[in-house]
């Protein structure tokens, strides 16, 4: 099962840091999400796109998780040559994770 089957996501950026929030559609799936979607799983999934650590923050009242991806944007919007300088694609890519 892909993460996209039980959740949706949003992403944002600040400098060369990107964050990706994942929220379950049904609150009953939050516990499963929190158990399986670790910072290590996200880091491994993004591979070489994220050059720094990945930190996970739990948002239980909103049934979501926030992942902070350090050194993920090659210097940030004004410096990177990436096609996606704001890191918006991370929100779609994270949903491809197998649970």
Language-model features and meaning:
Residues 1-99:
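Long, contiguous binding/interaction regions
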